[in-house]
């Protein structure tokens, strides 16, 4: 998967921005379906995007997929 730098730079192109954000929301939604409790909290997708923005600004060399898994684990708590 790409690094968090690519996530942060996504805002430069509307198509890339939409693709990255749709992927993240779909990934978290997929984890949500496989679990026993609602991780998404009624669909607060802005909060999901904001979490990833903060994570990727803090650790730009992280892989997007790993950051998304970490988000999923945090939401599952």
Regions found by a protein language model. Give the residues of each.
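Surface-exposed, polar helix/loop patches in the mature regions of secreted/periplasmic/lumenal proteins
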Residues: 45-77
């Amino acid at each position: 998967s790409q690094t968090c730098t690519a996530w942060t730079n996504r805002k430069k192109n509307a198509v890339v921005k939409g693709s990255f954000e749709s992927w993240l929301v779909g990934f978290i939604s997929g984890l949500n379906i496989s679990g026993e409790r609602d991780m998404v909290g009624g669909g607060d997708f802005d909060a999901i995007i904001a979490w990833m923005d903060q994570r990727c600004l803090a650790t730009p060399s992280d892989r997007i997929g790993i950051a998304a898994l970490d988000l999923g684990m945090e939401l599952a708590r």
